Amino acid sequence: MNRIIVLFLLTAILLTSCAAPVEEAPATPEMTVLETTVPETTESPTTVATEPPEERFLLTFVGDCTFGANPSNTYAGYGFPKTVGEDYQYPFRNVITWFEKDEVTFLNLEGPLSDTGNPMQKKHVFRGTTAYVNILTENSVEAVSIANNHTMDYGQTGYDSTVETLQNAGIPFVGQGCSSIFSTENGLTIGLFGAVYYKLDTEEIVSYIAGLRDAGCDLVIFAPHWGVEGSYRPTDSQVNLAHAVIDAGADIVWGSHPHVLQPVEKYKDGIIFYSMGNFSFGGNGYPRDYDTALLQQEVIRSADGTVTLGDLTIIPANVSSIEGRNNFQPTPYEQGTAGYDRVMQKLDGSWKGSNLPIQ
C-alpha cells in the first residue's frame, strides 16, 4: 500500500462533522549560499542544465462496495459475512495486482462500518463490522467515498463509527458536502469532493471544486452519487453537472449509484466516469447485471508542474468469480469473451440493452 498523507479535511454541508486531524506542511528550511572565489588559472567547469523528467502516476477507480449485507436478505447462508469471514484479502484477491501497482485505489464504500446502532426504516439497509476496514488496509485501497444513500443506514451512530474507523485507519474519505485533500508518497496532491444526488446544488459544488483548485491541488476529483438506478445512460442533469465541474477545475468525475456501468466521456481536459456500477457488493446475492470494471487513469506531471491526464486503461470484470450467484469477488473477464466486449460497449456508449427497472 502506498503511504497517504492526509493534509486536511474541509467541511461543508455535513450530516455530521467529518473533520480529520490536520497535518501541517513542514516549514521551508532557510538556504545559506556560500560565495567562493575561483582562481583565474582554473577553468570553470561547464554545467549542462537539465530539466527533471516528467512524473507519471496511476490511479485506480472502482464502483460500489458493500462490506456486509442486508439483515433481512434471503441469501444469508452464503452472504458477505459468511463468505468472507475474517479473510480480509478475499474480496479483492483477483484484482489486487492492479491495486498494488497504482498510487491510489478509490472505491465507493456503500454502507456504514459499525458494530452498534439501529437500522433505518427503509427497504435496503446495509452494514459491515468495523473489522472490515481491514479489507481496505490489506488490499491497497487508499481512499474512499462515503457520499452515498446508504452511509446513514444505521443512523448517526453508524455514520460516526464509520468516520472514526476510517480516520483511525488513516484512509482519506469524503462524505456529503465534504472535501478531503491528501498527498501520495510520491508527492501528488489530490483534492476530492463528494455529493449525494438529493443535495446536488450545482453552484455550491462548483464553488467547492474551484476552491480545491485554488488550494493548490495537483488533481481535483469530484465523486457524485447520482443518476437513475439500473440506467445505462446518464441523465441530462448528470451531463450538465459533470461538464460544469470540469469547467470549474475538476480533472476527474467519478460517479456511482446506478449499480450498472454508464459511459466514460472525455470532456475538454477532463474525464467523466458517469457510473462505475457494483464491485464487491454484499448488498445483492443475485444481481441482475454482473458487469463491472477497473478504470486506471494515468496522471502526468511535467517538469514545470503542469498536471495532465494520460492514458486510460480499462479492465472489464465480473462482480463474481463464480457462475449463478454473487460471491463478492470481482474477477477480470478474459479479452475476447462476451463479458469483456459487453463491458467495453457499456463504457463507450454503444450498448443497446434495455435499462433495468428500479427495485
Residue ranges and their predicted role:
Residues 1-2, 39:
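Generic cytosolic/nucleocytoplasmic N-terminal low-complexity/intrinsically disordered segments
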Residues 2-9:
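Sec-dependent signal peptide recognition
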Residues 5, 23-24:
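A taxonomically broad motif for mature regions of secreted/extracellular
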Residues 9-10, 221:
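Hydrophobic alpha-helical targeting segments used for export or membrane insertion
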Residues 11-12, 193:
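N-terminal leader/targeting segments
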Residues 14-17:
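C-terminal motif of bacterial Sec signal peptides marking the signal peptidase cleavage site
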Residues 19-23, 29-359:
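Acidic, metal/ion-coordinating pockets
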